[in-house]
C-alpha cells in the first residue's frame, strides 16, 4: 500500500468547554431498533402489574457524549487512607488507570464523609484517613483533580451534607478538633437517634454552613460538580423543638422537613450558579437519591402541565423504600421541576427482574421525570449486588442474568433522556471472582465503552457553551504532529481522525 493510500485525513473539531469537560453532542440520535427484553427463563419481561412488554435496544448505539462514571470512597474501602505522597499517587494512578481501561470519563470521589474534609478546609476538620497529610508540602486533592483532568476525567466532589457520626459523638472520623465555626460544636444543631448523629436540616445556620462548605470547595479546587447521595434526614429523627421554632406555616412533619431540604438545595443552587456566572464556569450540582421517589401502580404514559412538569404519574410502578416520605424527606421531583439541580443520578440498583422495584420501572419513570427539563439523567448501577455472592433478598435477582449490566444499559439506552451511568462502587468492579462483574468489565472495556468519549453536556449550561475553532492549525506529516493556537478558557480539545474518503462519519 503506497503512502497516499495510507494517509489519513485528520479532521480537527475543537470544542471550547469554558472551564468544563462537557462536550458538544455530535450525534444524539438513539438507535431505532428495539426488541423485547427477555427474562432469565426466556419469557417476555413485562412491566409490573401489566401486560406491557419491556423493550431494550437491539444493538448498542455507541453515543458520542455520555457520562461513564464510578463512585470511589475511602469510607467503604475502595481505597486506603493517605500515608505518603508517593503512596497516594500510586494508589490513585492505579484507580485512574483502571478507569481508563474501562472507558470511564468521570469519578465521583468522596471528599466529605462525616462533617470532615478530605481537602484543605477552614470550616471542617481533616478526615482521619488523611491524618498524615501536610498541605504545606502536598495537597492530595489538588493533585488528584489535575490528574483526572489530564486524562479527560471529570471530578465530581461527593459530600454527605448532614451526616456527622455513627458513634454518638459530634466528631467521628476526624483527625483534629472541630473548627470554632463548625455548628457541630453546639448540640442544639444536631439530631441524635441512638448512636447516629446528623446536622438538623431545619436550622438556618446549619443550612448556611453546608452551603459555605460547598462553596469553599468550589472556590479552592477545580471541581466539575458537587455531588450528594441519599443522606438527608435519618430514621427516627426528633426535631420537635426545631419545628416549634421554625414551623410558622403549621406544616405537617413531612412537609416541614421536605421544605427544609428544599431551602438548602435551592440556596446552594443559587450560590453555585452565581459563582459560575461571575467566574465563567459551569460547576454542576448533582444528586444521587435512593432509586424510588414515591411508590405507585402501573401507568402507560406520562402527562405534563404547561410548564413541562410531570403531573402523572408522580410515582414509579414500584414497592419499596421511597425517599419522598419517612424518613429521608427529599422532594427530588420538585428539584427537577425547578431545575435547581443539574443532574439526577438515582440509585437504580435493583436487577431487571426484581419483584418490587426493578431497574426497568425506575429508568422509565426517571426518564419521564426529567423530560422537558434542563436536568441530566444518569443511572446508578448496583454492580456491588452482582459482586456479592449472596443470593438472599434483592441480591438473588442479580444472579439471574450474568449479562445483567448489558441488559440494563440496553434498556436505559432506549430513552433519549438517558445521559449516562455510574457504577457503585470501584472496589466491586475489582471482584474478579464474580462472573457478573467480569462480564460487565469485559463488556464496557472491550466494547460499549472501549472508546473514551466526553461526558454528557449539561443541559442547563449548554446554551452558555460556544463552539470555538482554533486558528493556525498545522499538521506536520513527518512527525504526525498537530499544532494550533490555544483557545482561551478551554479545558480541553477533542480531535477526530477519519480515514481518507470518509469525512462526515465519526470514528472513535
Where are these regions (language model features)?
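Substrate-binding cleft of secreted/luminal carbohydrate-active enzymes
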Residues: 329-356, 369-464
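Polysaccharide-binding and catalytic clefts of secreted carbohydrate-active enzymes
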Residues: 112, 183-340, 349-350
Amino acid at each position: 500500500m503506497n503512502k497516499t493510500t495510507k494517509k489519513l485525513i485528520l479532521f480537527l473539531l475543537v470544542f471550547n468547554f469554558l472551564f468544563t469537560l462537557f462536550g458538544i453532542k455530535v450525534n444524539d440520535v438513539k438507535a431505532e431498533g428495539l426488541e423485547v427484553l427477555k427474562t432469565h427463563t426466556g419469557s417476555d419481561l413485562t412491566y409490573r402489574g401489566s401486560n406491557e412488554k419491556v423493550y431494550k435496544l437491539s444493538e448498542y448505539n455507541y453515543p458520542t457524549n455520555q457520562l461513564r462514571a464510578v463512585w470511589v470512597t475511602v469510607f467503604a474501602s475502595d481505597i486506603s487512607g493517605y500515608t505518603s505522597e508517593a503512596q497516594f499517587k500510586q494508589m490513585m494512578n492505579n484507580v485512574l488507570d483502571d478507569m481508563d481501561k474501562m472507558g470511564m470519563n468521570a469519578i465521583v470521589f468522596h471528599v466529605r464523609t462525616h462533617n470532615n474534609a478530605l481537602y484543605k478546609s477552614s470550616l471542617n476538620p481533616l478526615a482521619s484517613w488523611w491524618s498524615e497529610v501536610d498541605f504545606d508540602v502536598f495537597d492530595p486533592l489538588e493533585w488528584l483533580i489535575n490528574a483526572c483532568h489530564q486524562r479527560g476525567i471529570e471530578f465530581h466532589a461527593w459530600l454527605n451534607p448532614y451526616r456527622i457520626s455513627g458513634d454518638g459523638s459530634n466528631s467521628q472520623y476526624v483527625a483534629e478538633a472541630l473548627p470554632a465555626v463548625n455548628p457541630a460544636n453546639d448540640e442544639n444543631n444536631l439530631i441524635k437517634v441512638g448512636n447516629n448523629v446528623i446536622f438538623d436540616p431545619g436550622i438556618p445556620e446549619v443550612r448556611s454552613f453546608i452551603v459555605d462548605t460547598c462553596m469553599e470547595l468550589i472556590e479552592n479546587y477545580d471541581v466539575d460538580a458537587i455531588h450528594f447521595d441519599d443522606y438527608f434526614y435519618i430514621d427516627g429523627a426528633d426535631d420537635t423543638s426545631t419545628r416549634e421554632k421554625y414551623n410558622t406555616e403549621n406544616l405537617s412533619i413531612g412537609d416541614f422537613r421536605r421544605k427544609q431540604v428544599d431551602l438548602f438545595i435551592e440556596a446552594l443552587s443559587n450560590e453555585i450558579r452565581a459563582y459560575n456566572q461571575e467566574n465563567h464556569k459551569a460547576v454542576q450540582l448533582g444528586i444521587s437519591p435512593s432509586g424510588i421517589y414515591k411508590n405507585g401502580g402501573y401507568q402507560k404514559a406520562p402527562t405534563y402541565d404547561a410548564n413541562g412538569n410531570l403531573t402523572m404519574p408522580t410515582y414509579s410502578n414500584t414497592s419499596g423504600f421511597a425517599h419522598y416520605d419517612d424518613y429521608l424527606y427529599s422532594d427530588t421531583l420538585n428539584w427537577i421541576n425547578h431545575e435547581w439541580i443539574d443532574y439526577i443520578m438515582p440509585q437504580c440498583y435493583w436487577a431487571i427482574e426484581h419483584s418490587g422495584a426493578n431497574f426497568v420501572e425506575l429508568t422509565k419513570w426517571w426518564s419521564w421525570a426529567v423530560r422537558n427539563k434542563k436536568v441530566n439523567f444518569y443511572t446508578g448501577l448496583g454492580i456491588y449486588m452482582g459482586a456479592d455472592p449472596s443470593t438472599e433478598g434483592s441480591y438473588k435477582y442479580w444472579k439471574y442474568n450474568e449479562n445483567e449490566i448489558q441488559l440494563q444499559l440496553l434498556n436505559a439506552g432506549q430513552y433519549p433522556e438517558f445521559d449516562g451511568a455510574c457504577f457503585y462502587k470501584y472496589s466491586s468492579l475489582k471482584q474478579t471472582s464474580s462472573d457478573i462483574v467480569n462480564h460487565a468489565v469485559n463488556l464496557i472495556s472491550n466494547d460499549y465503552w472501549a472508546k473514551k468519549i466526553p461526558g454528557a453536556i449539561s443541559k442547563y449550561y449548554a446554551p452558555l457553551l460556544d463552539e470555538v475553532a482554533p486558528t493556525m492549525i498545522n499538521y506536520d506529516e513527518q512527525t504526525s504532529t498537530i499544532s494550533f493556537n490555544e483557545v482561551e478558557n478551554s479545558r480541553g480539545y477533542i480531535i477526530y481522525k477519519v480515514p481518507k474518503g470518509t469525512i462526515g462519519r465519526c470514528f472513535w
